[in-house]
Amino acid sequence: GDDSNDTATINAKLMDNAGVLSSLMAELYKAGANVLSVNQSVPIHSVADVSVTVRIAEMAITKKELLNSIEKIDGVNSVVLS
């Protein structure tokens, strides 16, 4: 069936600093999002594009709350949730 409500894709631009991706992953873990895949581009001008697909069916918070928590991470330049 249509399970588009079960998964979400997070597209973020991350500074190429140690710990930024793990901070992002920690937020997803805290939210109860189940990470299905992670794709990270080679950094250009110290910024890497990251795409994370997550299962959100069991998530404890809303997508908007998740977006807000990711935006607050030091080293996250931009984030879009689709």
Q: What does each model-found stretch correspond to?
A:
Residues 1-82:
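A conserved regulatory-domain signal marking ACT and ACT-like small-molecule sensing domains
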